[in-house]
Regions:
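Long, low-complexity hydrophobic alpha-helices enriched in A/L/V/I and glycine
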Residues: 37, 56, 71-74
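N-terminal helix-turn-helix DNA-binding core of bacterial DNA-binding proteins
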Residues: 9-54
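C-terminal regulatory/effector modules of DNA-binding transcriptional regulators
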Residues: 30, 191-192
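Amphipathic alpha-helical dimerization/coiled-coil segments
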Residues: 89-190
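Long, low-complexity, charged/polar intrinsically disordered regions in eukaryotic proteins
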Residues: 1-11
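Short, hydrophobic-biased segments on the C-terminal half of alpha helices
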Residues: 56-63, 76
């Protein structure tokens, strides 16, 4: 098994930033259904189950990270950048792996699958060497007590390669993502 290194604090913080559920929804929705136009109610129709705050936060993060763009005077309000399109492919790859391996559960939705898979992709490659020695079924013991089979762990190579390639192509964004992740954590701590 060839593991692609995504270790390092910057990568882990970037992965945490990319795992924001509303950001996953925003990027995936635009990738699947095309740009969101300026018609009244189009944002609410596309993201009816997100609160205005969740949607606003996701749009702000996506803009800050260079994933979406739009001109207030254009008919199209939000569209994905090339980086956003590539990230949508990473999300799809992660979700396919998770669906195949029923992770984190057999009935998980797309966002939950991506949100739980991205942190696995950033794990230290040394964990892969331990896969035969950890867990009751010879798999990788995950936080919460779940065990990932050796086959599932081995199959992480594809999604991890996709994420690593995206992070390397967007290395300039990692600093911004780390700042936003730290700021969001501080804001949440203050609010609690």
């Amino acid at each position: 098994m060839t593991r692609h290194s995504t270790d390092g604090l910057g990568h882990r913080q970037a992965i945490r930033a990319l795992a924001l559920p509303a950001l996953i929804r925003l990027v995936s929705e635009i990738a699947d259904n095309g740009p969101i136009n300026r018609r009244r109610g189009s944002l609410q129709a596309a993201f009816g189950n997100l609160t205005a705050n969740q949607l606003g936060h996701a749009i702000d993060r996506a803009r800050d990270f260079g994933l979406v763009y739009g001109d207030e005077h254009e008919r199209v309000r939000y569209r994905l950048t090339d980086s956003g399109e590539d990230l949508a492919d990473v999300y799809d790859t992660a979700a396919r792996w998770a669906r195949t391996h029923q992770f984190p559960a057999a009935t998980s939705d797309f966002v939950t699958r991506v949100q739980h898979t991205l942190p696995l992709l950033g794990q230290d490659p040394a964990l892969a060497r331990d896969v035969a020695r950890v867990g009751t079924s010879g798999g990788l013991l995950l936080p919460g007590g779940a065990v990932l089979s050796p086959q599932a762990t081995s199959a992480l190579d594809g999604p991890q390669a996709a994420l690593t390639a995206w992070l390397q192509a967007n290395v300039s964004l990692q600093h911004d993502m780390a700042l936003h992740t730290a700021r969001t954590a501080d804001e949440m701590e203050t609010a609690a």
